Each structure stands twice: as structure tokens, then as C-alpha cells.
């Protein structure tokens, strides 16, 4: 941020025109924003903003005269096209300051002469975390703004969705912060600028660097936060909003302060923050959330994610609630079973589900409509959404009432049913005021029925029937003056006037006729009536539009008085949509109801992968189901087998089954008994973290470290190929010791896939570990994958067979087989090792080329620069050529 003096010097402020000086004054206070500066019917951008935005939006970069002897860069956006351009700016994480004209040029001239500059002011700052417009925001995804305050080893997170008036505060341990951030996925994060000097804490936000908004330390002070909260909610003491600790108060205050600055005159009215306990929810670490592709694929797409498969919701608010369910599975048995009871109730009443879905899909996005109404940013269609929702709510209630009267319904269903209300008074008010069809009406006028307001009806009559009014007045004056040729005329100089011929002018005797002009052939007059009619005609459209906006504000106020009930109604409709969705997909996909217990049970019969099953079904193929029984004597499954045989799919499908069960949905299996999982961890796949300079192996070890440190006996841990990112020596040692630690220290349920066949002998030492492998058919060196998990251990990796399927050259494959035979002469013997930890492992290494291997063994890949790596490659090449020459000699 530049100082005022530096800013003015940079832009040569004192050489600017008065309007450009006004622009620079406003830009100085909004240096972090792209400034859209309203000039007539356009938003204009200058200097660097013009250059950036013209490239981003494909606009013509023009010039607006000269400034300080140089062309002034400028581009513009038509004001009526703003909403079509804004999304592209917001998607690129730009803040946009909207500067509007507060008066017309005519008003400015009256105020301060012809040189006056029109008053302008930033009325709103649009950011990715504070938007509410439909055109700027994804319909089925929450849009969170977060503020985080860290004290010692606890992070207090306040986060809100302005578009739905949701506000939550939660405390998490620092080591769980990245997992929590991946769950919330905030669009903006407000942090203290002091964190910029703490590299350790700042590393926790590596994936969110573009979303961080730094504020000065005082922004988060407890005393300031108290004042902000008291002013925002108009309360005497912050005790009124709940028992918040000091860091939670600071986080809540930071959010409210940020909103007040960004939204200027249109301030959100968030409810009191809901204090959430972490204990009731399953923790899914960031790696697991990513690798399981819960809400988006690894490439960032919705299609192909788990959510894309299970989302058949019919409303936007239902889609958002399902997104929250999937992001935040429950970890409390009674809460999970309450949800499952509702899902089961609807599953047993599929005709009811069909009837409800037909009704619910007619409900607009009442949640976001209500939020826009509360912040005075409502459009007519938002009020229409409330009206439609009130009407349909009665039909939904009537449909549910039929089954409730029969009894034997889940208690939780009554909690969903009770908020369904059809407020006749509010509905009739909206119905009497709003046009029945708003699809063809503009947002600023033409949406209120004429019959609702006598004054509006008069104005519209004037607009549509002005010629009739003029004709009636002309006939009246002819009768009063006895001049049959009297006319009412109009020109640009005099406006409307009464005209009679010179010879008839003497007949005008009434004083109400005021002389305006005499010409060679006629005399012109005016009257108060005519002037009033002319003024009304000129102002009728403006007055009608203003009156409609007044009526809109009155209707919004009436809705605001019922906002709490309407919010509960929206939640009920969302819940009905989600649970009907669960019943619908469970029936369509042949899912079963899981049994959730408080012990460590885990018995899946004929489990399937929800996503892959749907993808291959489209190809008319069948998914091979598999059992998984992680019970007492086999809490750990050590799974060996070749690549492409289905190990990773099996690992993922069991994690997905757990998640689906704990959100209250049926699962893809014949049966499922699951002891509630408190934390879900996975280490699947290999990827360098180039941004932070971490190699594949370092990423793998960091994630494994987190798993070993945070897992409990109630957790589910999924590990795939631990140790493969380093040498075979180290890899086996690490995988071995991790297995021992999970078995003897954590004692949790675990699926562990590996290519280190030497580990299978651990089954004779670790009593709760069982070996499983993937069934294959190997005939005459022709390999067929059967995708069935069976008890036992793979006797070889079949890696060369897979390489053959991939199309490696025959000469390479033959050489690989030769090397494999040499390696298999000397295997790791686990039974002869120390019981507690691997001391040493003896693996034969081909004797050729010895010098090359020695060079590689001395390398530390994590510390190499690209230039050093290239140099070493040349060195290895030369060494190999030299050794080949020596061999030939």
C-alpha cells in the first residue's frame, strides 16, 4: 500500500482534471481493489486497472485524452452488463470496488456551477467471500468467508455464508486446522498480518495463499471485537450471543467488521453465530478428502466426484445441504441413526418420495432470496420466491400429514415437519402486490400490480393514456372558451401550451389562462392544469418506478418480520430434499441400510465403489463386489497384488461406504455393520508438492506422520504403498515399522496395501493382521485381473506383466525379467528380524553397473537443484559408457 504522498506522485495527481482527481482520491483508499468508476451509463477504469481488466475481459483498451502528457489508459463496462462481467473478475480473486454516482450532472451544476464534479462514492466492495448475487455464486455450493484467530495450540474459526445467512464458530487443534480448512473450503480467509512472520503457522495455509486477506493485529483485539459485535447486533453485552471464548469473540468480530467495510450501505444481517462442537463430527484429513474425491475430482471437476453420483436433489438449497452433509459426516451414533431412520422411512414410502420431490422441485432458492431481502439487495423475483415457497409449503405439509396421521414415524421427521408453514397473511400480501408472472418484467419497474396502489394505477394510466388526457383537457377548454379551433401543442422550447388564433384571443378572459407567447398568427397560453399534466407525464415513468421500489421495500420489511420462520422453512425443505434424495438413490442404485454401532465393528458384505460402479454401468459392465471384515483378529488387512488389479479401488470404496453411512445415507453393499469412525485418514497416491519444495517422498512421510500422531482406536486408516518414494531398503523398513505401530499402539481398523511382499510374514507375528490379495488368473504368462479380494498373499508382483500390458518394448521386458531373477535370489527375511523394529535388511542388488549405483546411493534428491540434477545425469551417463567400455575390454 502506497502512502498518500507516494500515490499522488506516482499518478501525478496535481496535473489531473477535477474528475480524475476525484477518481484518484477514491482509488487511493481502495488500492487493493479494481475500481469501477461510474460515469453516466458506463463503469470506467483507468491506469493499471484498465490494462488488467481489458486483458482479463477481452475489452478494448482505449485512451481518455491525455494525463501529464501521456495517453490515459481507459476501458469501460456498460452499467446494464455489469453482472455478466463481474463473475470473471471475482473468479480470479479480484476485489471490485463499485463506485456509483450519487447525483445527476444537473444536480451537480445546481449545487456548484457548471464546473462541478458529480458526487461519487464506493457503495460496495465485491469479494469472493461476500457475494450474494445469483450470477456470481455457485447454486449448490456453500460460499464461506472465514476469520481465524490462533492462540497457543488452538485455532478459533468463525465462518459465514452471507448468501444464506449461516454463521458458525468452532475451535480446532492446530494440527487439525488443515483438515478443517479442506472441509470448509472458504473463499476468503481473514488473518492477522502478524502471521506473515511465522513461517510455521503460515505453512498451514499453503493451499489458500490466494484467498488470504491480511488485517492489522488490532483488527482482532478482544475489546474491538466486543464493540463490533455489540454494534452489529445492537446488544448491551456479548453474553447475549452465547458462551464464546476470547479467541472466538475475536474471530466473530473480525468477520462482522470485514462485512461492514465490504458491504458499506447494504449490510448483511447474520444470525448469532452457532457454536459447534468438533466431537460430533468425523474428522477427514485433507489428504483423504482430496484422494477420495468427495466433492470434486483430483482435477477439480464436479463430474466424477462422489457428490456428483449421490446428488439427485431437486433444489439449490437441498444441494448445498447435501454438500455440507458429505463434507461433515457425523461421529455420534444416535445422531447418525436418527438420520438413517428418516432415510429408511422415506425408502419404505417411495410413492411419498415421488410426490414430495415433485412438489419440492417447484420451490425456488428461498434461502438465498431471504438473505438478499434482509440486506436490502432484493430483486422482485426474490419476493416471488418467498410467495411460491409459502404456497408449496402447505402442499408439502399436507402430503406429509397423511403419513404422520398413521403414526409410527421417526421423531426426527416431526422436527422437519413442524417448521413447514403457509403464512396466509404474508402470502396474500405478496400475491396481491406482485404480478402473477414476473418473467417479462424488469427489476426496477413493472412488477407490482396496478390494483395494489391507487397512485401507481394513476401513474400508469398517465403513461399509457397521455394522449387521452390531453384530448379531454382540450375539449374542456374549447367548451369553456367557446373556441372550437383551440389546440394543445408541444415544442422543445415551450413544452406544452394552448394555442388559439389571433382573432379568437380576445375570447380568453379567464385568469387561469396565462399568456406565454404571441406570434404573427396565434397567441399561446398555459394553465396550472396543463403544467401539472405535463409535469406528471414527464415524470410518470420515474415516479412509477420509484413508487414500485417503495412498495418493494415495504414488502421486504413485511418479509423480514417473518425471517426466522422463513429460515426454518427453508431448512425443512432442504432436509426433505436431501432425505428424499437418499431414499431415491438408494432405491435406484440398490444400496442397503448400514447398521451403525458404538463398538469397533466393521463388516461389509459385497461392498462396491459408488462412483466406479456408476461409470462402468454406463459401459454395460458389472462391478465386482468385495467383502471387508476388520474384526478383532483381523483389524489390519495387509493387501498385496499387482497394479491395476483393484487394490486402490477396494481401499477407497470402504472409506466411501463409511462416509455415506455416517451422513445418514444407505451404502453400496449387500449389508454393512460399522462401528462409528471418529477420524478417517488415507495416504493414497504419489504427488510432488512443488510449490513448497517437497518431494513425493517428503509429502508421503508428512502425511503418514499426521496419521500416526492423530489416529485413535476408533479411526479408520487407509495406507497405499507406504515407503515407495525412497529406496527399497528404507521403504520396507518404514512400511514395516508403521504396521507394527498401528497394530500395537493405535490398534485401529486399517487397510494397508503394499508391493513389499516381504511384509506378508508379519502376519505370523502381529496377531490382528491378516494377509489378503487380489485374485488373478495367470495362464501361459497371460494375466487376467479378477478384481476379487481373497485371503492370502501374492507370491509375486506381476509388475512386468503390467508393463507388458502398457506396451513397453520387448527388449526392455526381457531385460527386466533377467534382473528380476537376480533380485529374487536374496529376499528380506522378516522372521529373523528384531520384534520391535527393523535393524537391517539384506536385499541383493545386481552387481552391474557398480559405479553408477554408488553415485545414486550418495544422492539426496530432496536437496538437488534442477541444474545439479542435470549435471548428475550427464555424470551417470558417462560412467555407464565407461563401465561398458571396461566390460568389453
Swiss-Prot record:
GO molecular function: ATP binding; ATP-dependent DNA damage sensor activity; damaged DNA binding; mismatched DNA binding
Binding sites annotated in the UniProt record for ATP: 641-648
Annotated TM spans: none
Keyword vocabulary terms for this entry: ATP-binding, DNA damage, DNA repair, DNA-binding, Nucleotide-binding
Keyword Oxidoreductase attributed: no
InterPro entries: DNA_mismatch_repair_MutS (IPR005748), DNA_mismatch_repair_MutS-lik_N (IPR007695), DNA_mismatch_repair_MutS/MSH (IPR017261), DNA_mismatch_repair_MutS_C (IPR000432), DNA_mismatch_repair_MutS_clamp (IPR007861), DNA_mismatch_repair_MutS_core (IPR007696), DNA_mismatch_repair_MutS_N (IPR016151), DNA_mismatch_repair_MutS_sf (IPR036187)
SUPFAM superfamilies assigned to the protein according to its UniProt record, in alphabetical order: DNA repair protein MutS, domain I (SSF55271), DNA repair protein MutS, domain II (SSF53150), DNA repair protein MutS, domain III (SSF48334), P-loop containing nucleoside triphosphate hydrolases (SSF52540)
PROSITE patterns cross-referenced by the UniProt entry: DNA_MISMATCH_REPAIR_2
GO process terms (BP): mismatch repair
Family: Belongs to the DNA mismatch repair MutS family.
Entries under PANTHER family matching the protein: DNA MISMATCH REPAIR PROTEIN MSH1, MITOCHONDRIAL, DNA MISMATCH REPAIR PROTEIN MUTS FAMILY MEMBER
NCBIfam families (alphabetical): mutS1, PRK05399.1
Purpose: This protein is involved in the repair of mismatches in DNA. It is possible that it carries out the mismatch recognition step. This protein has a weak ATPase activity.
Name the record gives this protein: DNA mismatch repair protein MutS
Organism encoding this protein: Orientia tsutsugamushi (strain Boryong) (Rickettsia tsutsugamushi)
Lineage summary: Bacteria, Pseudomonadati, Pseudomonadota, Alphaproteobacteria, Rickettsiales
The gene coding this protein: mutS
